[in-house]
């Protein structure tokens, strides 16, 4: 089950389509969907979590808590929409594209992809780009 929760005024459009997309990416990697909770929040909310749970006193766009068991993919993914907006501006992409990239980034971590080394970062980017193409295809069908 995939749920979308909001700790800010932000609200996703096309929740159903995004849920199907995330499910498809999970299945494409030979995994099963568990309970995935997206929590959209602001910088202050995510900074508090970053300090409390990771002992990092820095802003970030995403924090994910992985509860995956074997092939069952699940966890809580906290996303700062403020940080996503700033990053979109820095990377010269739309807010929506950056948000979708960050959303799937958390799931890819649950599937087993890392971004700790330059090589694994390249692979993560490839996986994100492939997932974004899947979303484009899915949205053109609907």
Map each language-model feature to its residues:
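Short active-site segment of divalent metal-dependent hydrolases/proteases
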Residues: 104, 108-112
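An acidic/histidine-cluster motif and surrounding catalytic segment
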Residues: 1-99, 111-142
